């Protein structure tokens, strides 16, 4: 039933996105200006028609199936119940897409929870030749470094189900920080533009895959 519902939803609500709400104590609501700014940029630059007021959706909710893409971020702990993990798994294998932005502190928690969702699938680094880096905007060197916490190189990881990328995880990039209002982190305009361009690539890929 959920698989059928998703196929209907993706055609009916193809211009809607949501922020993923989760338990565990982490701040799923971090970067409140990020998604609205990304939506505005995408609507202007890749001709999407996304609602300017994104909603939040819980991991275990059937409403998850209304959205072709959901965004997840935070700094701390993440916890999925078995039912939530199953709901997210069905959503992803049925055509949904999850973007996770490591807001520095999320990594050690989200990796454990993703194993609940896909016990037999490992996160893999995505090659720069992958279409997600080559939509309207080309990133032939991979993810841009947005927020410098250390000297680690930014990496894009993914979960692939039957050859299809269902989850994109930006690690050590802090991509969603670059989507926020300029006054929040004082990132240079050039850095913010790169972040928004990569973000719009993610949306474009999720909508057209």
Predicted regions and their residues:
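Sec-dependent N-terminal signal peptides
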Residues: 1-12
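Surface-exposed patches in mature extracellular/periplasmic domains of secreted proteins
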Residues: 49-57, 100-103, 121-129
């Amino acid at each position: 039933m959920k698989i059928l519902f998703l196929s209907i939803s993706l055609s009916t609500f193809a211009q809607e996105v949501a922020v993923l709400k989760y338990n565990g104590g982490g701040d799923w609501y971090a970067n409140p200006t990020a998604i609205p700014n990304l939506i505005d940029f995408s609507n202007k630059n890749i001709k999407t028609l996304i609602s300017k007021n994104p909603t939040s959706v819980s991991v275990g909710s059937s409403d998850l199936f209304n959205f072709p893409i959901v965004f997840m971020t935070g700094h701390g702990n993440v916890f999925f119940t078995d039912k939530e993990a199953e709901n997210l798994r069905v959503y992803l294998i049925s055509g949904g897409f999850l973007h996770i932005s490591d807001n520095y502190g999320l990594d050690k928690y989200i990796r454990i929870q993703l194993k609940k969702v896909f016990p037999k699938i490992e996160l893999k680094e995505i090659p720069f030749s992958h279409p997600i880096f080559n939509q309207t905007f080309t990133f032939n060197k991979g993810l841009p470094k947005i927020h410098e916490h250390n000297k680690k190189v930014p990496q894009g990881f993914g979960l692939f189900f039957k050859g299809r990328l269902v989850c994109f995880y930006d690690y050590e990039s802090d991509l969603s920080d670059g989507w926020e209002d300029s006054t929040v982190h004082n990132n240079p305009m050039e850095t913010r533009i790169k972040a928004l361009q990569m973000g719009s690539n993610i949306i474009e890929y999720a909508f057209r895959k």
